[in-house]
């Protein structure tokens, strides 16, 4: 098996922005959820959101790109810049065909598209912007990153709801193992326009609470759903583990195989548990080797119970530390799991387990939840999970760098 290394990070999340060395760690125990500021949420079920403060696109991107792109694409471009700089990648040293991009998104550039349609239909603007033809598209982030950095190798986009970020990392890993030297990957979602969240509203998963510290309570008997978050989890370059030291790059860790099960009812017991077991088997890792689990944290009883049962089924009740740092950011949709991966690798380097905040855990779940503050732990292996609407279940093993 060819090891695949994570060599850089560019984080754009409600509680962190930039390279890992430029700010506080993404597990800093604070809530980033607050009332939506980029639109009036009063007519929508979810009143709160995790928004990214302080990002000014003009400080990071050429002026010509700003009017052509949605805000999430600008975040994607900036995060890719940060990740490549963090990895010490000089793109000029690579053949363009040796570099690719894989991202995930389920909504695309919704704010740009919605603004243009409102101008056309409600404000008398006679035509749409020419940039509408691509700015709204869910694949635009892969395209714009590849254009900006001249990356002409294998590329793509993954659409699998909340599981998309892990699926994008897995696809990038496959491409590296097949011979592409460098793949930039990650996931991004908008939360800055009503249309971005509206498709999720009928599913009933979002919290209607207006209390930031009580709105998103996974594994809590008072859980009312999740708080949506906007932004990009992380854009890590992936490359062969042996190639990174050869060019003097620092390795954050290794991305292991991913198990992805799209069928919600496979006839093989718990689909989530089966995804976890498959990821462990493919990584050559025993359940006892996993020292922390980053939970998906749906925030409602049926989802939380199913996830807790799957974790206990594989690892044993209360046998492995479990955390859900998404309680500090909201669920970033497909961007959430890549942020978990970044958080896991940085936390393993720091010798801690990030906390779950605000919750009063329900004893029924029988989980060893890491609560309120970081827990010191010299651990080297973690598992992340994600579940999307329609039964997408993904699990990924990550290991600390040597």
UniProtKB/Swiss-Prot annotation:
One of its GO terms (biological process) is antibiotic biosynthetic process. Residues 192-205 have a biased composition (Low complexity). Transmembrane segments: none annotated. The keyword Lipid metabolism does not apply. InterPro entries: Beta-ketoacyl_synthase, Ketoacyl_synth_C, Ketoacyl_synth_N, PKS_Beta-ketoAc_synthase_dom, Thiolase-like. It comes from the Bacteria. Keywords: Acyltransferase, Antibiotic biosynthesis, Transferase. Its EC number is 2.3.1.-. SUPFAM superfamilies: Thiolase-like (SSF53901). Residues 1-400 form the Ketosynthase family 3 (KS3) domain. Pathway: Antifungal biosynthesis; monensin biosynthesis. One of its GO terms (molecular function) is 3-oxoacyl-[acyl-carrier-protein] synthase activity. Residues 1-30, 188-222 are annotated as: Disordered. This putative ketoacyl synthase lacks the active site cysteine. Belongs to the thiolase-like superfamily. Beta-ketoacyl-ACP synthases family. PANTHER family: POLYKETIDE BETA-KETOACYL SYNTHASE 2-RELATED, POLYKETIDE SYNTHASE-RELATED. This is Putative polyketide beta-ketoacyl synthase 2. It comes from Streptomyces virginiae (Streptomyces cinnamonensis).
